[in-house]
Amino acid sequence: MTTSAAYVLSKQAIERASSEFQLTLSDFQVQQIQQYTKILWTWNDKVNLTAIRDPLEVLYRHFCESMFGSSLVPVENCRLADVGSGGGFPGIPLKIIRPALHVFLVESNVKKATFLAEVVRELGLTDTRVLVSRYEELGEEVAPLDVVCSRALGDFPNFLAWAASPRVAAKQVLLWLGGRDLDEVRAQPSWVWSEPISVPKSLQRFLLLGSRID
């Protein structure tokens, strides 16, 4: 299936996929997803933003899986950092479905950060900042955070220690994980974990929410 910039996901495909994740989107949100995918395909020829070449799989794996986490974001206008944002997942889809969020997209790769800035600009996303930095170097620029999230960061001990540190003081972390990572993450100190939630239409993919122990 083509992944050229000319390919546009249909409104029907987006609505059908979102319904399978128990998500309801407005016409405007559907249009934002369509615009986002067009920018993604254009840039993916120059910057490796996703290895997935099937637009429908991108819709399910990146957009719907990201937006599925919105039910675990506790406050409508909370401060949320997406660490290792890459192609903007999960931070930008979360912003699309929860437009009152204050979002920080943290990405150390300059080319990927430039892509993120273009998406933010073209979609007209307010209260959304792209930070070109390693997460370990951030503190007062983002603190205090209500939620730190990540889909593919790894290095869980250092990441969770940073999120719990006084200079960041994140109240919660929201992670998209494979089943083999669950035990490692739940063994980390400073956090109490909810029960993992299976991600629809996936094999051994889970959402895990942790709350910082004061």
Residue ranges and their predicted role:
Residues M1-N77, A81, K111-K112, E118-T128:
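Class I SAM-dependent transferase core
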Residues L40, L94, G210:
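Residue-level signal for inorganic ion chemistry
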Residues M67, I92, A161:
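Active-site phosphate/pyrophosphate- and oxyanion-stabilizing loops and adjacent acidic/basic residues
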Residues D82-G86:
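Conserved S-adenosyl-L-methionine
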Residues G87-A100:
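Conserved SAM-binding loop of SAM-dependent methyltransferases across substrates and taxa
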Residues R98-D214:
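S-adenosylmethionine
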